[in-house]
From Swiss-Prot:
Belongs to the PsaG/PsaK family. This is Photosystem I reaction center subunit PsaK. NCBIfam families: PS_I_psaK. It comes from Synechococcus sp. (strain WH7803). InterPro entries: PSI_centre_PsaK_sf, PSI_PsaG/PsaK, PSI_PsaK, PSI_PsaK_bact.
């Protein structure tokens, strides 16, 4: 049974600067989407440097970066499947 699970596990990509750049770009895109679509981005606990984070609260930034990591994971797996990495 364990061997059949190994057969369906996708090959992971080693961490390189190209992979990091894709993750950073996906997080920036997610923050831009969140900034444009979150109704109350400044509700809740404030970030330490509000001007650096665009006035977004801790919860909004956490949600945006979580979404960015989901986008990045999909982009990295998709690009590695296509043979880019």
């Amino acid at each position: 049974m364990f061997l059949s699970l190994l057969a369906i596990t996708p090959a992971s990509v080693s961490w390189t600067p190209k992979v990091a750049l894709v993750m950073i770009i996906c997080n920036v895109i997610a923050i831009a989407i969140g900034k444009a679509t979150i109704k109350y981005p400044n509700e809740g606990a404030k970030m330490p440097s509000a001007s650096f984070f665009g006035g977004m609260s801790h919860g909004a930034m956490l949600g945006c970066t979580s979404f960015g990591h989901l986008l990045g994971m999909g982009a990295i797996l998709g690009l590695s499947t296509r043979g880019v990495f």
